[in-house]
């Protein structure tokens, strides 16, 4: 179920403050965040946000095509190691 339009998008307060301060100072710094559920808004365009995936922070450069998506969509939490080539035990 999607979020109601009258509520607006969810953005963590600390992340919104950091982006706002960097926009006022016209600086480009990497912003560390653990808030994977925050929605990308137009004021974040051009910034690099390092999103935590459970083990490390992955830096993501925000572009205009990412607006409306969640930050967590751009940092995978699981590493796929590939399927087993000749695993005869699992066939039985």
Curated annotation (Swiss-Prot):
<keyword id="KW-0694">RNA-binding</keyword>
<dbReference type="InterPro" id="IPR002222">
    <property type="entry name" value="Ribosomal_uS19"/>
</dbReference>
<dbReference type="GO" id="GO:0019843">
    <property type="term" value="F:rRNA binding"/>
</dbReference>
<dbReference type="GO" id="GO:0009507">
    <property type="term" value="C:chloroplast"/>
</dbReference>
<keyword id="KW-0934">Plastid</keyword>
<protein>
    <recommendedName>
        <fullName>Small ribosomal subunit protein uS19c</fullName>
    </recommendedName>
</protein>
<keyword id="KW-0687">Ribonucleoprotein</keyword>
<dbReference type="GO" id="GO:0003735">
    <property type="term" value="F:structural constituent of ribosome"/>
</dbReference>
<comment type="function">
    <text>Protein S19 forms a complex with S13 that binds strongly to the 16S ribosomal RNA.</text>
</comment>
<dbReference type="GO" id="GO:0000028">
    <property type="term" value="P:ribosomal small subunit assembly"/>
</dbReference>
<dbReference type="InterPro" id="IPR005732">
    <property type="entry name" value="Ribosomal_uS19_bac-type"/>
</dbReference>
<keyword id="KW-0689">Ribosomal protein</keyword>
<dbReference type="InterPro" id="IPR023575">
    <property type="entry name" value="Ribosomal_uS19_SF"/>
</dbReference>
<comment type="similarity">
    <text>Belongs to the universal ribosomal protein uS19 family.</text>
</comment>
<dbReference type="GO" id="GO:0006412">
    <property type="term" value="P:translation"/>
</dbReference>
<keyword id="KW-0699">rRNA-binding</keyword>
<dbReference type="InterPro" id="IPR020934">
    <property type="entry name" value="Ribosomal_uS19_CS"/>
</dbReference>
<dbReference type="Pfam" id="PF00203">
    <property type="entry name" value="Ribosomal_S19"/>
</dbReference>
<dbReference type="GO" id="GO:0005763">
    <property type="term" value="C:mitochondrial small ribosomal subunit"/>
</dbReference>
<keyword id="KW-0150">Chloroplast</keyword>
């Amino acid at each position: 179920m999607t979020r109601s339009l009258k509520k607006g998008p969810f953005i963590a307060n600390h992340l919104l403050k950091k982006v706002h301060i960097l926009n006022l100072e016209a600086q480009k710094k990497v912003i560390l965040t653990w808030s994977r559920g925050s929605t990308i808004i137009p004021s974040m365009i051009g910034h690099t946000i390092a999103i935590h995936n459970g083990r490390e922070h992955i830096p993501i450069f925000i572009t205009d095509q990412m607006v409306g998506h969640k930050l967590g969509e751009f940092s995978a939490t699981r590493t796929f190691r590939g399927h087993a080539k000749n695993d005869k035990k699992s066939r039985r």
